[in-house]
C-alpha cells in the first residue's frame, strides 16, 4: 500500500461526527482544487444540531460545476454510517409522507443531493438499485428532472479520499495511524493565546518565485502564483523563510 493510502474498511471505524467531518473536509479540498474558497462549504459539526436533512452543504456562486465528485455548485451531502437499502433511502428522503422540503428545494434550483453511506460497499447492480430508489422518491416532484442524485458507498468515499493527501493525513491521524513529521493543514503559526492570527502582509515581507525572474511579490500577490505552481509542478515544493 502506498504511503498516502488507506483501506476502505478502515473507514468503518469512523463515528457519525467523524464521517460528517470527513465529507466536509473532502468537499472543501475538492472545490479548493478547482479554484474556489473552502468557505463555500457549510456543515454543523454536530449530529445533534437540527439540520433539515443537510449534513454538508456546498454552495459555490457559479453557474456550473462538474468535478467528478461534485457535479453541481449547490450540493447537499447526507452522511450515513450504516447501510442504506431502499427502505432506509425512502425513509430518509420522505418527511411527514411527502418529499423532504430540502430535496424539493434542491430540485427547484437544479442542485444535487448525495447520500454517503459508510456501511455500504456496492456492486454496480446494488448502486443502480439505490439510485433507482432515490429517483422513485422524487417521481411526483415537478422539478424531478432538474436535480442531480448520487449515492456514494465506502469504495467511492475512499476513492475521493485518495485524491486529497492532506485530508488523508487527517483521516489517518483520526484512526491512530498518523505519520511522524507529517501534519494536515492547521494553525501552524501557533500565535500567543488571545492574539489575532492574521496573515503577515506588512510592507517589506516579500516572496520570490522560481518563475518570477527575481521579482519580489507581497504575500497577498504571491498566493495565487504559489497555488498554481503547486498544482502544475512535478517537483517537490519547499517554502523557506518566515
Segments predicted by a language model, with ranges:
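Mixed-charge (Asp/Glu-Lys/Arg
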Residues: 1-241
